[in-house]
A protein has these predicted regions:
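Active-site glycine-rich loop that binds ribose-phosphate moieties when present
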Residues: 43-59
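Beta-hairpin (beta-strand-turn-beta-strand) motif
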Residues: 9, 19, 69-70
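Single conserved hydrophobic/aromatic residue that forms the stacking wall/gate
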Residues: 1-12
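A generic secondary-structure signal marking the coil-to-beta-strand transition
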Residues: 8, 36-37, 63
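Short capping loops/turns at secondary-structure boundaries
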Residues: 19, 41-48, 65, 75-79
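Short, structurally constrained coil/turn elements
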Residues: 4, 34, 58-60
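A conserved C-terminal secondary-structure "cap"
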Residues: 54, 61-126
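Class I SAM-dependent methyltransferase SAM-binding "motif I" and its flanking Rossmann-like core
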Residues: 13-46
Length: 126
């Protein structure tokens, strides 16, 4: 059931954010968030300037990040694209947590991620 799957994905993402963990470049699709990794913004109380500053720091050069003990944020040129990106972050979170069950995943090099980021500018799904 789709809503059950979505709830599981959100739960996985929240596990990463509650541990203040970002997502390294274990998979090339991490680049869809705009960087070589997906950072996790430091925790601050909701609705505060401190939280806003922490999120902006984590988003620098990126389009999405996790937010410690909150969840995630994603932005794009349209609302529908922002939702697609948020879904991709959910999927990547699930893949990362799953891969950790087998041990530490192989991390792609910065040079490889630069290549991926360059190609990602023109990437269209579907």
């Amino acid at each position: 059931h789709l809503s059950t799957r979505r709830q599981r994905q959100m739960c996985i993402r929240d596990r990463l954010s509650t541990h203040n963990k970002g997502i390294p470049s274990f998979h090339y699709m991490v680049a869809m968030a705009g960087g070589h990794d997906i950072k996790c913004a430091k925790y601050a109380t909701f609705g505060t300037r401190e939280l806003s500053k922490n999120i902006l720091r984590a988003l620098k050069g990126r389009k999405a990040c996790l937010i410690a003990n909150h969840g995630q944020i994603a932005f794009e040129e349209s609302l529908s694209k922002a939702f697609e990106l948020a879904e991709e972050v959910e999927n990547i979170s699930l893949q990362y947590i799953t891969s950790l069950k087998l041990g530490k995943p192989k991390i792609l090099s910065i040079n490889e991620m630069k290549k991926v980021l360059s190609k990602a500018k023109n990437y269209k799904r579907g």
